[in-house]
Amino acid sequence: TAAMALSFGATSASADCGEVSITEMDWASSAVVTAVANFLMTQGYGCDVQVVPSSTVPALTSLAETGKPDLLTEVWANSTPSYEPLRAEGKLVELTNVLSDGGVEAWWIPAYLAESNPELTTWDGIMANPSAVGGKFHDCPSGWACDIINNNNLKAAGAEAGGLERFQHGSGETLQTSIAAAYADQAPWFGYY
């Protein structure tokens, strides 16, 4: 789930807002959410906003250890095991889902591929014919929480031995571009998003 979370010690919104630290995670949608939050807080509440470049794991670690930053503008809560304990301990409060449906992280194939090859909707089907998905798993960039999770799951499932290469993208943008290019060409694609 993509959520906006407020740390326990965060300054409340008021006419005398003061200093507030907010994250800008290292993916495109977070940059938009951060820009909107920054604008509203500075223009609407007179806050002195400090934007902190980060990503999920470092931001949550900092929050757990220091109570900062005050606002995590976009967190994919299902990709990090520390989110729920921090929420349960009262160290963060979830304000809202940033994306209308909350966001879904998963392993995907394009609908056109599933329709023409329904067997590819299962792991066993993919491993029976990895070339049908292009012979590779498009993975998230290093530093994202999904990097470790996906790598461990692929190793445990024997992906490489079964003929499926893990291709780790250098950024969220190149991962998105690979999806868009596959759709434009109706080409095989399998990976995380």
Predicted regions and their residues:
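Ligand-binding cleft/hinge of the Venus flytrap
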Residues: 37-45, 130-165
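A conserved helix-loop-strand patch within extracytoplasmic ligand-binding domains
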Residues: 91-142
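Solvent-exposed loop/turn segments at secondary-structure junctions
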Residues: 27-30, 58, 77-81, 113-115, ...
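Short, well-ordered beta-strand elements
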Residues: 16-29, 47-52, 134-138
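Structural recognition of the beta-strand scaffold that forms the well-ordered cores
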Residues: 21, 50, 70-74, 105-108, ...
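Pocket-flanking alpha-helical
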Residues: 34, 52-91, 174, 178-182
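Ligand-binding pocket segment of bilobal, Venus flytrap-like solute-binding proteins
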Residues: 61-62, 69-73, 145-193
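Gram-negative bacterial Sec-dependent N-terminal signal peptides
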Residues: 1-14
